Regions:
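Selected transmembrane alpha-helices and immediately adjacent juxtamembrane segments
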Residues: 1-38, 120-170, 177
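Structural signature of hydrophobic alpha-helical transmembrane segments
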Residues: 5-6, 36-53, 97-107, 136-146, ...
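Hydrophobic residues within alpha-helical transmembrane segments
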Residues: 11, 15, 50-57, 74, ...
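Juxtamembrane helix-boundary/capping and inter-helix hinge elements in multi-pass membrane proteins
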Residues: 38-42, 63-70, 157-165, 188-192
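Signature of the 12-TM Major Facilitator Superfamily
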Residues: 43-50, 101, 168, 172, ...
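Hydrophobic alpha-helical transmembrane segments in multi-pass integral membrane proteins
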Residues: 44, 86-90, 141-147, 181-184, ...
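Selective hydrophobic functional segments
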Residues: 47-96, 179-223
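Transmembrane helix exit motif
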Residues: 56-67, 88, 102-127, 214-215, ...
């Protein structure tokens, strides 16, 4: 990896970490999209694993709701593992541009519905079967694109998690997704020692960006957080859709 590429990679992870610190997600979406400019998809995904894993574990542990979200989200996370491993054959770039386009459009539609105050609601009794289904679909999309967002994020928001619960639940879900993706990449021998130092450097700058973002989030009211959460999803969706059209 040349010095120019490394500087670009580190800048990407600062921005991605900052976004994640504010709204609780966005690191893989932003990183995979921008790193694809200079790196092959499997190499970009391999470089993402360490920063994604550590920042998500940190986010998962940062709060007092871990036990409750673990109890509530185990069906979703079980489905994520099954979907990711089942979709391993698609890792090289699923669905081509149309996969990214469809994912982006779905994300924008969800964000717009949230901004319009259309509240999705999942009955508690339905979580037992809808959680695994949402997890399997999320896992398949993760294997295809390296992005962990759809439909796990709408599902977690629809079961009524509050601001801090939602951010911690996102950390849990993304930790599971990252580990499942890591197993898939290891099976395809995508990890090389050449990526070790760049990955460590990416981790450091991602954490710095995330800390800055968390400081901003701490100052947001629940209403402001909801607004920025959906605006962030809208921007990520537009970015993915634009990527799919190029």
């Amino acid at each position: 990896m040349t010095a120019t590429v490394l500087v670009f990679v580190l800048a990407v992870f600062v921005v991605a970490g900052f976004t994640k610190g504010i709204i609780g997600l966005g690191l893989p979406t932003i990183s995979m999209g921008l790193l694809a400019v200079v790196l092959p998809p499997t190499e970009a995904a391999a470089l993402l694993i360490l920063p994604s894993l550590i920042t998500n574990v940190w986010q998962m542990l940062d709060g007092g709701h871990l036990r409750s979200v673990l109890r509530r989200l185990w069906p979703l996370n079980l489905g994520v593992c099954a979907g990711t491993w089942g979709g391993a054959a698609f890792l090289s770039g699923l669905g081509g541009p149309y996969g990214a386009l469809a994912l982006g459009v779905a994300l924008m539609a969800y964000a717009l519905s949230g901004l319009a105050a259309l509240k999705l609601a999942v009955p508690r009794a339905a979580e037992v079967w809808l959680g695994p289904l949402a997890g399997v679909v999320t896992g398949a999309i993760t294997a295809a694109t390296g992005v962990f967002v759809i439909p796990a994020v709408p599902y977690m928001q629809a079961i009524g998690l509050q601001k801090d619960e939602l951010v911690q639940a996102l950390g849990l879900s993304f930790t599971v997704s990252t580990l499942a993706l890591a197993v898939t990449l290891a099976g395809g021998r995508a990890f090389t020692w050449d990526l070790a130092w760049p990955s460590l450097a990416a981790l450091v700058v991602a954490i710095l960006g995330m800390r800055l973002g968390q400081a901003v989030r701490a100052r947001l009211s629940p209403q402001a957080f909801r607004l920025w959460f959906f605006l962030g999803l809208l921007a990520l969706g537009a970015y993915l859709a634009a990527r799919g059209l190029v």
